[in-house]
Amino acid sequence: MAVISMKQLLEAGVHFGHQTRRWNPKMAPYIFTDRNGIYIIDLQKTVKKVEEAYNFIKQLAAEGETVLFVGTKKQAQEAVQEEAERCGMFYVNQRWLGGMLTNFQTIRRRIDRLQELEKMEENGSLEVLPKKEVAELMHEKEKLQKFLGGIKEMRRLPGALFVIDPRKERIAVAEARKLGIPIVAIVDTNCDPDEVDYVIPGNDDAIRAVRLLTAKMADAVLEGKQGEQLAE
């Protein structure tokens, strides 16, 4: 049983690449043709590549490793958060803060601060403080929650990154590469596939395309976790 069908990919518009004047020649092997100045991605290749990525993520999750979902562009934010939460993984969907991987200890301290503020809110210790101070602390908490909420429970570096648009998320990609963390990514016709370990050639701009492929990776995590439980 194929992980994904041509029909699903077509219906979600995964085959539409970027304009022909905005392309990376390294993506040539994944391009089927061009139509009205737009590259059309070879979906037969995408089907194969989705399967490879799916099996890799599934195996990773079965070994108890984690996946960090990264997509900060408008079209990706919602799918990234919802699908990562659905499979119990971590996500960054607002802004990649430099050092999120390479300076993880410092980021962890910011997360500890977020958790400290949450505790203060829960146990009522804010109630004794002046209103102005409470407002400042709440503002700090909201800001930390916005940028770090998706990695709050991440105690160590992830086993892999799943990235939507490695060109937009180039800082995340560079950090993962520096640390030898494998990268799975939706790679459009204007991206460099050499930066990515598991390339999924596809449209990274259409909400439906992003949602479909992100959901598939979340499914892989869930299937892998099931395997991990069975192994126990």
Swiss-Prot record:
PROSITE patterns, alphabetized: RIBOSOMAL_S2_1, RIBOSOMAL_S2_2
CDD domains in the cross-refs: RPS2
GO molecular function terms noted in the UniProt entry: structural constituent of ribosome
A single cellular component GO annotation: cytosolic small ribosomal subunit
A Gene Ontology BP annotation from the UniProt entry: translation
Keywords tagged on the record: Ribonucleoprotein, Ribosomal protein
Superkingdom per UniProt: Bacteria
Pfam family, one: Ribosomal_S2
Protein name: Small ribosomal subunit protein uS2
UniProt gene name: rpsB
